[in-house]
Amino acid sequence: MVDKTHETEFSKKQLEASSSGHGGVLIDAEENGIHDQAEQRSCLICGDRATGLHYGIISCEGCKGFFKRSICNKRVYRCSRDKNCEMSRKQRNRCQYCRLLKCLQMGMNRKAIREDGMPGGRNKSIGPVQISDEEIERIMSGQEFKDEANMPEHTWGNNGDSDHSSPGNGVSDGNQPSPVSTLSSNRSVELNGYTTALREQYIGNAMAQHYQFLPHLFGYAAQPRSLYPQSHTLIGQLVAAEDLAPLGTPMLIEDGYRVTQVELFALLCRLADELLFRQISWIKKLPFFCDLSIEDYTRLLSATWQELILLACLTVYSAQVLGDLANVTHKYTPSDDELHSFSEDGMEVMEKLIYLFRKFHQLKVSNEEYACMKAINFLNQDIRGLTNVTQLEQLNKRYWYVCQDYTEYKYPHQPKRFPEIMMCLPEIRCIAGKLVNIPLEQLPLLFKAVLHSCKSSLSSYRTSSSPCVTKGTAPAN
């Protein structure tokens, strides 16, 4: 039913992506099986190969590091589903909330983590602990961290507010979604301004030993300010690395011609090929390209390529996607068999994609913001097998700060813009992970439904076209 040449080409990417849990077009399948030759104990959190007793329970290096970062940085996550997501080696990175929840439920002991965050627990004899449901809820909601931060011995200066932020998917005060969490007040910064020391820490010295986290996402300077010079430089470098030219894939179809499923599928394959090629070229132009190993770049691209492509389609190529590509899908009529066999997973992905298209049309993400979002998503230090996690985390934090600095400077009257933009990243990651599991023969119908719905709902609100985005309204909550 489907063109075999393109099916083989595209399905290879899909299958390799599915096998790694994040996506993977470049990692050899044998690479992840090296350590599976001998019988090993399994991590109690995700079932991966355990490396020892960490914070009281048998676990792998990945869950050990995740638990340590979550507790040390006092991160507060959120689950977009029913707080009961599957935890496996392939699925563990898709929901940080459920991963931390299982760490606590299995008995990982946060008191075994050194306060300075350095390697080596405070007491290696400490075993698993039993935590009440109430205490777990306090930790997951961030209330436990707030209570600790409000203790008198942890106050700082004359500013009684000790609420700070750090990169991560979370929720803020007032139950407002935000990718932030609080840090202990001995690392506090003023909420209503920006200190030179903090800027130098993040942007001026990428390899500094100790990093303070961002000012609170909702704490904005009272007076108008200029963009920090190094933020301007770093953003300029990211934008320069992008190929923002229109996609070269032909999309024009003669009037009256009916597009077949095979033809539409072949077009989607060519689009995926071109977009993937652009991501590979983008990596070579990154300002930090020489700072990381080829092995780490390979793993990062393998894990994030589908997310990068989806982000590009939602932003810099959205006008072309909702224009030329939507016109092609409009000329395709699915058969009754295709309609009846469309899966529940496909329906879920369709609804989430429609929501994201509308959300990005509401935000009108600029090229500068897109470039920062892309770099932040790419620099994912939670991916298995990376050789320089510390440096990746430092680079990630740098571009978090740069993006926040830019949005606060460019959109001073939109105080929630930065957290709204950042909260789109876990949504993209979730959808991309589900998209690679959709049967290939269902993709033409999926994209037809998504683009038809988006174009129909947005056309009545569109007042002008843009090379980056198209104006529209937000979806109803």
From Swiss-Prot:
Q: Name one Pfam family in it.
A: zf-C4
Choose any GO biological process term that the UniProt entry carries and state it: anterior/posterior pattern specification
Q: What is its main location?
A: nucleus
Q: Which SUPFAM superfamilies match?
A: Glucocorticoid receptor-like (DNA-binding domain), Nuclear receptor ligand-binding domain
Disulfide bonds listed in the record: none
Question: Where is this chain's protein located in or outside the cell?
Answer: Nucleus
| Superkingdom of the source species | Eukaryota
Residue ranges of every copy of the NR LBD domain listed in the record = 230-461
Q: Where is the signal peptide?
A: none
ZnF NR C4-type residues are 43-63, 79-98
Gene3D superfamilies linked to this entry: Erythroid Transcription Factor GATA-1, subunit A, Retinoid X Receptor
Polar residues biased stretches:
156-187
DNA-binding region extent:
40-115
Print the keywords alphabetically: DNA-binding, Metal-binding, Nucleus, Receptor, Transcription, Transcription regulation, Zinc, Zinc-finger
The segment annotated Disordered runs over 147-187
Q: In which tissues is it expressed?
A: Expressed in germ cells, being predominant in previtellogenic oocytes in the ovary and in spermatocytes in the testis.
GO terms (molecular function) for this protein are:
estrogen response element binding; hormone binding; nuclear receptor activity; protein homodimerization activity; sequence-specific DNA binding; zinc ion binding
InterPro entries on file: NHR-like_dom_sf, Nucl_hrmn_rcpt_lig-bd, Nuclear_hormone_rcpt_NR3, Nuclear_hrmn_rcpt, Znf_hrmn_rcpt, Znf_NHR/GATA
Q: How does it assemble?
A: Homodimer.
Q: Which family does it belong to?
A: Belongs to the nuclear hormone receptor family. NR6 subfamily.
Role summary: Probable orphan nuclear receptor. Binds to a response element containing repeats of the motif 5'-AGGTCA-3'.
What is the official name of this protein in its record? Nuclear receptor subfamily 6 group A member 1-A
The organism's taxonomy opens as: Eukaryota, Metazoa, Chordata, Craniata, Vertebrata
